[in-house]
């Protein structure tokens, strides 16, 4: 599969449905603007879904799992074996996102792109194997061109499946020991930030561990300083699951499926996606602001106002999943409230 599709045109939200939804909001039995951002969310979903009565019931959550070669630099508080162990946990339904997906009635897809501690074939896990791990970004590019293409395509495959199920909302998540280091390196390269400003605790590093992580990122940035395009920076500094998220976000925007972005790593992927294809930005909504140090800078770069700030830093799409009830409330109010005329209530 060629990768030039990522530069193709994105869908355009329906301006007529946006206007119709705005008009309905003005007629509902409440003062104008009294429901705050919930009103805006309903209108935005109406434009995205091309309907006056939007919904957020049919949700597709895809969690991409992959290991990172940079884990060899000691940038995580957990051993690399945890990635494969968590894939098993996803399959068994014991991970946070599995619990949240069940609670929400959402479809959960777990995609194994390559882990060192390979759990093999598991129920409810799609195997899109690329390699046991990306390469160590302090020594060489994270991915070959072929690996990058395959990872991006794996994300697009999720959207093809989601589209066939008439999905109303897509949520991407990730799992991979060392991936906050790769995401921070990508963010530094894209935003011209110092590693000290982007390196965070990740899985629970102390101050000394965070300082070491920043040093590792500095080494990686120096090695790949000649990478100038967003795609080449992704290839050299990213990882399989980050590239899959990029592919999923672009494919979703092209298919006209709204995306709810999770935390630090997924927002780094969203930034790459928008740099590759600016039309993607119009299809992104941001679930929460993570406790991870660099997330605020990424959100600012995307002019994003997240829905929640709960000091989360788990990943897995968990923060975005927690925000889904807000979207459902926005739609329920928009669709279910009476208008002034229907209720026989005097308008202002």
From Swiss-Prot:
UniProt GO molecular function: nicotinate-nucleotide-dimethylbenzimidazole phosphoribosyltransferase activity
Keywords in alphabetical order: Cobalamin biosynthesis, Glycosyltransferase, Transferase
Annotated EC: 2.4.2.21
Catalytic activity: 5,6-dimethylbenzimidazole + nicotinate beta-D-ribonucleotide = alpha-ribazole 5'-phosphate + nicotinate + H(+)
Domain of life: Bacteria
Family recorded in the similarity comment: Belongs to the CobT family.
Protein name, per record: Nicotinate-nucleotide--dimethylbenzimidazole phosphoribosyltransferase
Source organism of this protein record: Xanthomonas axonopodis pv. citri (strain 306)
Species lineage: Bacteria, Pseudomonadati, Pseudomonadota, Gammaproteobacteria, Lysobacterales
Gene (UniProt): cobT
């Amino acid at each position: 599969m060629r990768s030039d599709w990522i530069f193709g045109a994105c869908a355009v939200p329906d301006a007529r449905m946006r206007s119709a939804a705005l008009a309905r909001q003005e007629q509902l039995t409440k003062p104008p603007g009294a429901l705050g951002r919930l009103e805006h969310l309903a209108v935005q979903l109406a434009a995205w879904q091309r309907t006056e009565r939007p919904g957020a019931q049919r949700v597709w959550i895809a969690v991409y799992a992959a290991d990172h070669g940079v884990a060899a630099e000691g940038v995580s508080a957990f051993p690399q074996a945890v990635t494969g162990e968590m894939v098993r946990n996803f399959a068994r339904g014991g991970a946070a996102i599995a619990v949240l997906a069940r609670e929400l009635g959402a479809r959960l897809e777990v995609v194994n792109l390559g882990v060192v501690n390979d759990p093999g074939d598991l129920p409810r896990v799609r195997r899109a194997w690329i390699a046991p791990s990306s390469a160590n970004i302090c020594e060489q590019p994270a991915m070959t061109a072929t690996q990058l293409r395959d990872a991006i395509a794996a994300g697009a495959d999720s959207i093809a499946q989601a589209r066939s199920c008439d999905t109303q909302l897509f949520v991407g998540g990730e799992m991979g020991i060392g991936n906050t280091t790769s995401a921070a390196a990508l963010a530094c390269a894209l935003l011209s930030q110092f590693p000290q400003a982007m390196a965070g605790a990740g899985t629970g590093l102390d101050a000394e561990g965070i300082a070491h992580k920043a040093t590792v990122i500095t080494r990686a940035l120096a090695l790949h300083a000649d990478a100038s395009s967003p795609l080449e920076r992704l290839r050299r500094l990213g990882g399989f699951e980050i590239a899959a998220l990029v592919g999923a976000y672009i494919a979703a925007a092209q298919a006209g499926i709204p995306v709810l972005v999770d935390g630090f790593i997924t927002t780094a992927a969203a930034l790459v996606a928008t740099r590759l294809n600016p039309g993607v930005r119009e299809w992104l909504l941001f679930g929460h602001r993570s406790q991870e140090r660099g997330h605020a800078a990424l959100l600012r770069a995307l002019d994003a106002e997240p829905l929640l700030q709960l000091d989360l830093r788990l990943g897995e799409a968990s923060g975005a999943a927690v925000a889904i009830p807000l979207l459902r409330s926005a739609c329920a109010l928009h669709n279910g409230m009476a208008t002034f005329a229907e209720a026989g209530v005097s308008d202002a």
